[in-house]
Amino acid sequence: MKELFMKEALIRAKIAFERDEVPIGAVVVKNNEIIGFGQNRTIEKNSVFAHAEIEAINMASKKEQNYRLIGCDIYSTIEPCHLCAKAIVASRIDNLYIGAREPKEGSIVSQDNFLDKLFHNHKTHYEIGILESECKEIIQSFFKAKR
């Protein structure tokens, strides 16, 4: 099931790629059903907050009519930044599944261990490496084309 949901997140990343946004996608899952999805839309929305994970969390919160997404998991093609990691914790998401590490901005294991901090009022568990090569490939090809 993890691969299936990460494939859905990759679809969102491909949409971002086609729109010339950084190709990161995310889906929020509850009871094996996608209740929220998103891709980076920072350029489209002129908003630093329009990251894939936050877009997916916002959609799921609207559907659930609750910002607390207890019993939910989130799948992100790339390791979340601090902004998204805080949103994941604040929304009480149970599990974070990551496609590939982000060596420059990743706040889960690459640049920080944000989810392991003791000051959080909620513990989100994480796993890295779901469809890692596919997730790496899309973001690397995007930035290669930009250079």
Cite the ranges covered by each PLM segment:
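Zinc-dependent deaminase
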Residues: 1-19, 67, 80-147
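Small-residue (primarily alanine) positions within well-ordered alpha-helices
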Residues: 9, 13-16, 26, 52, ...
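Short, basic and Ser/Thr-rich N-terminal targeting/leader segments
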Residues: 20-24, 70
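Short beta-strand scaffold segments in enzyme catalytic cores
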Residues: 24-32
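Short beta->alpha transition motifs characteristic of CBS
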Residues: 35-42, 125
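Residues that line or immediately flank small-molecule/substrate-binding pockets and catalytic motifs
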Residues: 42, 76, 100
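Conserved Nudix-box catalytic region and its N-terminal flanking loop in Nudix hydrolases
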Residues: 44-47
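Helix-adjacent hinge/juxtasegments
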Residues: 49-50, 54, 58-87
